[in-house]
Amino acid sequence: MNTLGRFLRLTTFGESHGDMIGGVLDGMPSGIKIDYDLLENEMKRRQGGRNIFTTPRKEDDKVEITSGVFEGFSAGTPIGFLIHNQRARSKDYDNIKNLFRPSHADFTYFHKYGIRDFRGGGRSSARESAIRVAAGAFAKMLLREIGVVCESGIIKIGGIEAKNYDFNHALKSEIFALDKEQEEAQKTAIQNAIKNHDSIGGVALIRARGAKTNQKLPIGLGQGLYAKLDAKIAEAMMGLNGVKAVEIGKGVESSLLKGSEYNDLMSQKGFLSNHSGGVLGGMSNGEEIIVKVHFKPTPSIFQPQRTIDIKGNECECLLKGRHDPCIAIRGSVVCESLLSLVLADMVLLNLTSKIEYLKTIYNEN
């Protein structure tokens, strides 16, 4: 219900304008050094209020670890952590407390639960994704132990698409742009949306790779039927607010190709292409895992919109508040965290795949 993962399980709680949001990460092996600098940096990457291209709401996003860590290392017990909400402005939503905001979750949440938490969307707010980023930082600490790195960036804003992918540039870019040559045009598209009291959609690219040059990813992460790696990746990404489509490898373009064009041919040195995006038969094949995540435009726009109230009466909705003009930007960081969580979960699952692995653990002496 509120949990992601099987062997590494993240459960989250809290609402956008509540006192705090939090999570419990269960299944983290003991003995992993907690990198507090990494944790803080990941939270800052997702943080709003850093420039005009994100929401003006700037939370401190300090992660308070309450359990599961002893003397700087994971203890093997559930890691509990909290993030306090300090910049919420519920009054911005007073005028729409009985209205349904178009393309928001207000309508479905109200009909499912019978409760209208109008304060920034309550549980359905993207504020909850801060917990996923914190948990993703812990997952990255685990993956680092086996030489796996996840990274992300923006490849498309509206119709302006990157032609080159530079993940190092994305780390320095205000909008996490992968293509320096297209960055200004992408920024202009966002600024034009802001001027018109509108928003704009975008596409994030997330990849997992070996930490060292020419280092491959582990082969066999995932299972062939009911725990397919690509299915778990898609499930995690689609569970994030605003995501409308997920592609792995060539994705939808695959349906336009012939087998002779799509197949990843092999040599003694390995695969000659990576149209599969690093996944075959539901399992990692050692190549880079390539994921594209498509975000819809932010539904919170500052234009009059036609809607209904909780009694079904037609009315006009004019929003206030602080909102991202393009949720894909900060969403890319969350997707990177989600891929880290999925891969860490699959690494732990893989320990059960061969008896040799268990013998290594239990027959050391």
Curated annotation (Swiss-Prot):
Superkingdom per UniProt: Bacteria
Family note: Belongs to the chorismate synthase family.
Function comment: This reaction introduces a second double bond into the aromatic ring system.
Signal sequence coordinates: none
GO molecular function: chorismate synthase activity; FMN binding
CDD domains: Chorismate_synthase
UniProt: FMN binding residues: R123, S124, S125, N241, G242, G281, K296, P297, T298, P299, S300, R322
Cofactor requirements of the protein: FMNH2
Principal EC category: lyase
GO biological process: amino acid biosynthetic process; aromatic amino acid family biosynthetic process; chorismate biosynthetic process
Alphabetical list of InterPro entries matching this protein: Chorismate_synth, Chorismate_synth_AroC_sf, Chorismate_synthase_CS
SUPFAM superfamilies: Chorismate synthase, AroC
Keywords for the protein's UniProt record, in alphabetical order: Amino-acid biosynthesis, Aromatic amino acid biosynthesis, FAD, Flavoprotein, FMN, Lyase, NADP
Organism: Helicobacter pylori (strain J99 / ATCC 700824) (Campylobacter pylori J99)
PANTHER family: CHORISMATE SYNTHASE (PTHR21085:SF0)
Protein name: Chorismate synthase
Cofactor note text: Reduced FMN (FMNH(2)).
GO cellular component: cytosol
Binding residues annotated for NADP(+), in chain numbering: R46
Reactions mediated catalytically: 5-O-(1-carboxyvinyl)-3-phosphoshikimate = chorismate + phosphate
